[in-house]
């Protein structure tokens, strides 16, 4: 069954395809539009690549946590990520809120190249993201830490 799907973000428009044997969502992401996924997990396609999120746990404060893999590359990422505020940038990158495998805290924002499997920590948790002409403005609305990401080549990629 194919239907238009609006998630918790009002401007987000995704295509949701349901398979009767598997409740995992298939989502075609759009650049800059946050995606929030539920406990069923999701396979997200973006510019010729794909990331698959599989449910792992839900912490006491809510918001599901997922393990992630890049099935076209045969790579399982070595951290878990929250299924909220997943933002795809440029043609290659996913910005996600991540945690160490088996935990839910501390949260760190991570930039992931879904075409190569490389990733770079942004060093802190940024829950407010704004794309501007001069770069990506990232803010932690709880402790007011902020940064502007201008050049991804300045990050330490793993």
What are these regions (language model features)?
Residues 2-36, 56-80, 103-124, 142-158:
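Surface-exposed loop/turn elements that mediate protein-protein interactions on large endomembrane-trafficking
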Residues 7, 50-53, 68-71, 128-130, ...:
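Generic preference for hydrophobic/aromatic residues in regular secondary structure cores
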Residues 55, 97-98:
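Recurrent small/Gly-Pro-centered beta-turn motifs in extracellular repeat architectures
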Residues 23, 29-48, 78-92, 97, ...:
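Repeated scaffold domains used in trafficking and secretory/extracellular systems
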């Amino acid at each position: 069954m194919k239907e238009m799907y609006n998630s918790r973000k009002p401007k987000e428009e995704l295509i949701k395809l349901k398979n009767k044997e598997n409740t995992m969502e298939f989502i075609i992401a759009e650049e800059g539009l946050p995606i929030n996924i539920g406990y069923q997990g999701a396979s997200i396609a973006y510019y010729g690549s794909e990331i698959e999120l599989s449910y792992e746990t839900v912490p006491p404060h809510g918001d599901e946590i997922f393990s992630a893999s890049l099935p076209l590359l045969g790579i399982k990422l070595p951290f878990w990520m929250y299924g909220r505020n997943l933002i795809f940038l440029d043609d290659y990158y996913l910005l996600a809120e991540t945690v160490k495998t088996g935990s839910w805290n501390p949260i760190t924002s991570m930039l992931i190249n879904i075409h190569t499997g490389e990733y770079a920590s942004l060093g802190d948790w940024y829950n407010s993201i704004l794309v501007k002409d001069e770069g990506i403005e990232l803010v932690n609305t709880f402790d007011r830490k902020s940064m502007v990401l201008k050049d991804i080549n300045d990050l330490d990629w793993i």
